[in-house]
Amino acid sequence: MKRTIAIVAGGDSSELVVSLRSAQGLYSFIDKERYNLYIVEMEGHRWEVVLPDGSKTPIDRNDFSFMENGEKKQFDFAYITINGTPGENGILQGYFDLLGIPYSSCNVLVSAMTFNKFTCNQYLKGFGIRVAESLILRKGFEITDEEVINKIGLPCFIKPNAGGSSFGVTKVKTKEDIQPAIEKAFEESDEVMIEAFMKGTEITCGCYKTSDKEVVFPITEVVSANEFFDYGAKYNGESQEITPARLPEDTAERVRLLTSAIYDILGCSGLIRIDYIITEGEKVNLLEINTTPGMTATSFIPQQVRAAGLDIKDVMTDIIENKF
């Protein structure tokens, strides 16, 4: 009997549109001969299932069920592809844990920790992993321009501590731009991260593990036409993405080993993608960890799956079946 899978998309952040695009990608990637697929759209208190005829029906949040043709239907598995809250920060994971519904991503603790960039990077720094110098700023607290310059330096990145898709991120080059950048970042998050600029080659590496296998994908090199890998570069084609990355083999191997190690240190589950920057001397520096990576047709993970010579349908089946 086919399992019924919810592709859970939407969310309560600026990344909603990106998430819905990932849902369409996943709908095309997951094996429809093996699974019954439904996209579940979440936005605030609106939780709806998209039915085969395109109409939408509400989700009963008491048990994550829905009605179709007068029949109550239950989901066997949730593939979470929400970027931002509530799907990337542990909230939905806790909900599904309460209901006993298996899901694709990391658990509550890991999701919450990786969503908090500052906390996650400081934690991994304790394992000897290189990260940029940074500081955290919470709402209600102020920081002077001089403090930023003295502690972090210019240029620097000012960004939401919780969030993705480069919403609210500013590369700050001058003293005059510091406070406006902080205000912009606070529009996306209650905490702002101020991070030192590192000059180098941006790369990203995907990985997943099951009970019987470990897969670390080929690395992608990101060459942005913009100041940094911002929203336009990510989603509007304003970047060149090269898979496999143009790295010396020993550097590439270190990145692959580090990706696998971080997966285990944090206790990740499902597909993750880790962003790095390679600085002078082939130093590998962690940027951030994505536990619900984008899954549009042109996203990094599908690119890396193709470069590895794998079938993405098989990868999706691995992710789902590993939870049963």
Where are these regions (language model features)?
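ATP-binding N-terminal substructure of ATP-dependent carboxylate-amine bond-forming enzymes
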Residues: 1-109, 113-115, 119, 138-146
